[in-house]
Amino acid sequence: LILRRKSTLAVRFNFTGTVMFPKKDAKRPFVKEMEKNGRKMLSMNFGIKESDNNMAFVEAFDGEQETIKSKNADNENIEIKWKDRFDDDVVSSVASYRKTTIDLGEEFDGRHEFVTLYDAIKYLQENLPKYNGKVTVTGQMVKEPYNGKYYDKFKIQSVYAVADDKKNRLLITADIYYNKDSVDKTDWKTEKKIVVDGYIQQYINKDEGNKFIPQQFVFNASKYDENNEKHKKLLDYKMKYIDISKKTMQHLLWECVMLNGAETVEFDESQLTKAQKEQIELGIRTLNDFRPAGSIFGDRVTEYRLFDPKLTGDFADGIVDADMSASEFEDEIYVMASDENMDDVMKKAEKKDEPKVEEEETKTDSEPEVDEDDLF
């Protein structure tokens, strides 16, 4: 089978917010030190809080090694001796996508580049608790199988300080594959919500290569004002990329906003009891008389909400046909064993065989227009 699509676009994340450290006695603490086969290992885990009710955790894991296997700027295999990993010439020779970059500002001596996550973790362990302010963390989102389910992991590649007035946001950028049958409009009339049961591509291991993995996305138009002309134009614009008519698989690069918590909801009569509604009908009370103090939150959810198509590169003209028949696409969907976990997958994988994945960098110096900023 010869597939006619270009190299895989990694699913990238760009999270901006406040750092939240796990409790010291947490099952997954900020940093956990361990030893395996005589090698020191480190794992890191901390949250990026977008708001009081929306937060995502990012992570890193690495260990000491005699020889570091990496890639140079030409994507060629290189080997680095452990003792040489801080050498400036060595660091500069490594491809940017194989390095971890940290910049917590001039107070922390600016930009630092590491050829191992192990050293990046140690640096963050010492310095991140001393830092006050917002950060942006970027990296790759990976779906890891465990006992028949996928769990989303956000692997750190860079951490840097940002201005306090930068808008908090949990953003991912994904090349999403979908067709007409992927789009579920069941709740459109009642909730202004569309569910897209699409797919993303991910490198599995050297035996499997790149495979398609199911991923659900949501388009929520409940905040669009039908009386606002710009909102109407924006809605029509986005719908032409969502409510597609083709049966063959299409794909498009989307910016998505991650919601991992409870969303604030507007207070209205639907939240009143029958007795309270009767008082309003009789003019005894008004809706404001029953309005609770503070914000009202809905159910806790984890959703990736379609925000804006990224019309760059191969997608400059919009959505692209995947150029695959239905059977070809089905053959490329990854099927995991019900009892499989990531350790099973990684046993087959070797870093030196892992291909370079294209990275669609998320611009951090521009934000969507204010009128559109919260339409997701």
Could you say what each language-model-derived stretch is?
Residues 2-376:
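OB-fold and OB-like single-stranded nucleic-acid-recognition modules
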